[in-house]
């Protein structure tokens, strides 16, 4: 039996017929994968849990059943559009977008870091997964940043060095006026931030 390790990122208490259950949201940062678990007992955030795709375990103990699984294996990373926040995702979650002007690979501390993976599959995708579970943008973004950080550090570079290099390019991207935006872009982050300027540019540049 192949087991995959996840970290619990959120918990929701449920009362079902006078019986308490907990919905657990957990993510594997190494190979970006999301599971939603119906658990019979609670665990704390950041608890390491394991799953075979059907059951969820803490150690050798079964704590619940997996209700849904999402992973990045069938998600496309598209770099052919202008994206005001550098990264984004389609409404259906099947495509992650990165701004075409953002370098796809950055040289950081002597290593080549693929932004399509760090920002695309290890930030934007987890953020979309959380948003689709009705978490508000700030919390979804916070969880996604944590996943991105764990992945980046696993590559052997420091989070500070990574952020310093990324931020240089983020400022350049945001200063540009959008020329072409994907028609399927999920606008939830812009709407939450009430970024009217960005929303106006996106609507004008949709192709």
Task: Describe each PLM feature range.
Residues 22-24, 117, 121:
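Generic low-polarity alpha-helical segments
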Residues 119-131:
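Active-site recognition of the HExxH zinc-binding catalytic motif
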Residues 2-43, 47-58:
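Intrinsically disordered, low-structural-confidence terminal and linker regions
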Residues 32, 40-46, 54, 62-111, ...:
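Metalloprotease/metallohydrolase-associated module, dominated by Zn2+-dependent proteases
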């Amino acid at each position: 039996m192949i087991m995959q390790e996840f970290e619990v990122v959120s918990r929701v208490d449920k009362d079902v017929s006078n019986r308490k259950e907990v919905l657990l949201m957990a993510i594997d940062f190494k190979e970006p994968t999301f599971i939603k678990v119906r658990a019979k007992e609670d665990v704390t955030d950041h608890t390491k849990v394991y799953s075979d795709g059907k059951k969820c375990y803490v150690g050798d103990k079964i704590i619940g059943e997996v209700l849904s699984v999402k992973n990045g294996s069938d998600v496309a990373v598209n770099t052919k559009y202008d994206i005001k926040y550098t990264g984004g995702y389609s409404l259906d979650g099947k495509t992650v977008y990165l701004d075409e002007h953002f370098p796809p690979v950055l040289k950081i501390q002597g290593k080549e870091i693929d932004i399509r993976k760090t920002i695309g599959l290890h930030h934007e995708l987890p953020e979309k997964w959380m948003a689709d579970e009705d978490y508000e943008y700030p919390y979804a973004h916070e969880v996604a940043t944590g996943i991105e950080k764990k992945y980046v550090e696993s590559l052997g570079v420091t989070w500070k060095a990574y952020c310093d290099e990324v931020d240089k390019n983020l400022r350049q991207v945001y200063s540009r006026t959008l020329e072409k935006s994907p028609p399927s872009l999920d606008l939830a982050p812009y709407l939450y931030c009430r970024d009217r300027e960005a929303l106006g540019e996106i609507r004008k540049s949709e192709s």
